[in-house]
């Protein structure tokens, strides 16, 4: 594994609650943030960092991702938790930041919505939303 490890959404929430230096980075696209929703960290006195791993609509990896995120999160020792829809993009982002020298990068393995259920709907069988963690939608 090329990053610190995988956390399920409940473990991620616990770490964010216990360690004020921990940051949650949502690497989904702007349309996903707008139409699907966002993790709500206001009860912890902060907000998720929004930095897309891929550029919409082409969905190519953003070559500036690491540099832009490093400007926002200069503490290379703080825990950084990456979340996407279901864990794939966030895993790649965690690996990229680890390769750049960040020491405690975690993937929220089930993501915000988790995998689809038998009816091909997300957000019901796994992920941040299904875990009953706080989230908001515009």
Indicate residue ranges for each PLM-predicted region:
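Rhodanese-like catalytic fold shared by cysteine-dependent sulfurtransferases
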Residues: 1-23, 30-79, 90-138
């Amino acid at each position: 594994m090329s990053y610190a490890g995988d956390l399920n959404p409940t473990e991620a929430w616990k770490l964010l609650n216990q360690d004020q230096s921990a940051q949650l980075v949502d690497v989904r696209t702007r349309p996903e943030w707008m139409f699907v929703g966002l993790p709500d960290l206001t009860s912890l006195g902060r907000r998720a960092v929004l930095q897309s791993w891929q550029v919409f609509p082409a969905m190519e990896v953003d070559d500036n991702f690491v540099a832009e995120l490093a400007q926002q999160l200069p503490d290379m020792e703080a825990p950084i938790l990456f979340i996407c829809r279901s864990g794939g993009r966030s895993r790649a982002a965690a690996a990229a930041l680890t390769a750049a020298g960040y020491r405690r990068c975690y993937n929220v393995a089930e993501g915000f919505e988790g995998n689809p259920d038998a009816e091909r709907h997300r957000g019901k069988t796994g992920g941040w939303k299904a875990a009953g963690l706080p989230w908001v939608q515009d």
